[in-house]
Structures are given as structure tokens and as C-alpha cells.
Amino acid sequence: MEKDERKAIMDKEIDLIQGCISRMAQNSFIIKGWAITLVAVALALLPETFDAKLLCGVSVVVTACFWYLDAFYLKMEKLYRLKYQWVIENRQKSDMYCYDLNPHNKKMWSPKIENEPCILRVMITKTLVPIYGSIIAFSLWMLFHL
């Protein structure tokens, strides 16, 4: 394969991976918005018509689910970033795994990375704990003080 042709393939592959990264980041952003909106509605508007303790309990469960989903999307974004880095470093040398968009293909990760990022570690990052931790803490506080 010629150098120009190989560069064109790499550019297209990078564009595809960047699209996946952007989609995961957008999904994470949307999840945060939905989580905050739903919990705010549940805690602010509905206690007059429903049992407040039940709503606080539901808020904790819903927030935990959104927290997990957000961590999942951030983990996937991280995996696509590993793939992006591998393509930049290796595509000029080889056609192996050309257009492979499977983020779990460990052969397309940097040799420094041995294991897939753990979703629980992603959940306790400094970007997610303040958002979801504060919502859960407030919901639990209301649950035990109402």
C-alpha cells in the first residue's frame, strides 16, 4: 500500500474513532442533565402528592443508575481514546485491525495498559463523585430527616 493511501485510511479511521469519542462524551453529558432534572423534579415538586420518603429512596436508586450509566459512557470514551492513540502510533506501520471500532480489542491498546478500566474506578473519579455523590447524600439526608 502506498504512503498516501495509508494516510487516507488512517485519516478516515481517526475520524470514525473521533465520532465514537464525541458520541460517548455527548451521552455522558445528556445522562448528567437527565439525572439532575429528574431528581430535582422528584424532590421539589412531587412530595406534596407522594410519600416524601419513598421519593427520596427512589431518587437514590435512580441517581445510582444514572451514575453507573455515566461511568459506563466515560469508560467507553476512555477505551476509544486508547484505540485512537494506537491508530496514531501504528497505522503507518501496519494494516492490522484496519477500521476495527471494537473498543474492547486489547491488541489495539498501548502496551502500558494491561487491563480495561474498571467501571467502579471510573465512578469514583473527581468529575462524577461531586455530582452524583451530592445528589445521593442530599436524598439520604432528606430520607432520614423527614
Residue spans for each PLM region:
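Hydrophobic alpha-helical transmembrane segments of multipass integral membrane proteins
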Residues: 34-37, 41, 60, 64, ...
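Hydrophobic alpha-helical transmembrane segments
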Residues: 42-61, 66, 137-146
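Membrane-water interface of alpha-helical transmembrane segments
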Residues: 26, 49, 53-56, 122, ...
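Cytosolic-side membrane-entry/anchor segment at the start of a transmembrane helix
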Residues: 1-45
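A hydrophobic membrane-anchoring alpha-helix module
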Residues: 97-146
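Inner-leaflet juxtamembrane helices
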Residues: 55-108
